[in-house]
Amino acid sequence: MDSRKAMLILGLLAMVLLISSEVSARELTEEVVEKSDEVNDAKYGGYGRGGGYHNGGGYHNGGGGYNGGGGYHNGGGGYNGGGGYHNGGGGYHNGGGGYNGGGGYHNGGGGYHGGGGHGGHGGASNNGN
């Protein structure tokens, strides 16, 4: 009779140990996945303030591009400090660029509206200086 009780207790302990180890493994897996997602978000960006090579990427206030660049709204874009669609830096170096508010190659206004040229001079389709 004592051996049956001992076997029953050992069996119950084995089941508890098995269940707790599976729960621990699941929690560890979820934690690793969360950390991996955080690292990927930091590296490659997303929709808000992320990605690219350096301060890059995204749709809203996104860095994007190679250095400080890119995005659709208030985006840096371009190669260095440039680009975007709305209020975008654009261009190759500190260029205004984009569709609204800028463009050009070097500190140029440029673009479709309020724009630009090659070196801060010249026209666009509307209000160019």
From Swiss-Prot:
Keyword field contains Cell wall biogenesis/degradation: no
Signal peptide per UniProt: 1-25
Domain of life: Eukaryota
UniProt tissue specificity: Expressed in axilary buds. Detected in growing stems, leaflets and floral organs, but not in roots.
Region described as Disordered: 110-129
Family per similarity comment: Belongs to the DRM1/ARP family.
Full protein name: Dormancy-associated protein 2
